[in-house]
Amino acid sequence: IRGFAIGEDIVTSPRAIYDIEIKPADTGVAVNARVSNETAHRLQSRRRSMAGPSGCGLCGIESIEQVTRDIAPLQSQALPSQVALDKALTDMRARQVVSQSTSGAHAAVWCDMEGNIVSVREDVGRHNALDKLIGWRSLNPTDGFVLVSSRASYEMVAKAAPAGDGG
């Protein structure tokens, strides 16, 4: 929830989420997040007409204006070396535990600048895997870069940028 809210620019900081409550429901789980009035207004203006999407970053939007959003430019930072990228790519598959057992999960990983994998988040939906990683990063800010096991679409880049994950 935290990563989705940050990646979708619903909140500008993890501190804007006061409380998260998860309850069993008839057909799954219900998640309630307590946020400020300003955040609630932002959420209402970005409302989508579907619950629990597992994939498409544009699915469920109600108007074309919701496709683009203002994204603050990231501060200039060093890029990972080719050696670091090669190391992370080589090591990523071995760290994808869910994918190894199901052959049906995407991964988003956080790597340090040397290409060492620091965190792995997996999900059937590539956007969800990235949301999970963004949520983890909001609690564990470190230098590094994101690597995903699937294509990095416009929506995924736009999701990672507000979290400061431009590397």
Model-identified regions with their sequence ranges:
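Intrinsically disordered, low-complexity regions enriched in acidic/Ser/Thr/Pro/Gln residues
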Residues: 1-108, 113, 119-120
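Acidic, divalent-metal-coordinating active-site segment for phosphoryl/phosphodiester hydrolysis
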Residues: 153-157
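A conserved acidic, glycine/proline-rich C-terminal tail/linker
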Residues: 163-167
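Glycine- and Gly-Pro-enriched alpha-helical subdomains that act as flexible
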Residues: 98-150, 162
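Short, flexible, solvent-exposed loop/turn segments with mixed acidic/basic and small polar residues
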Residues: 22, 158-159
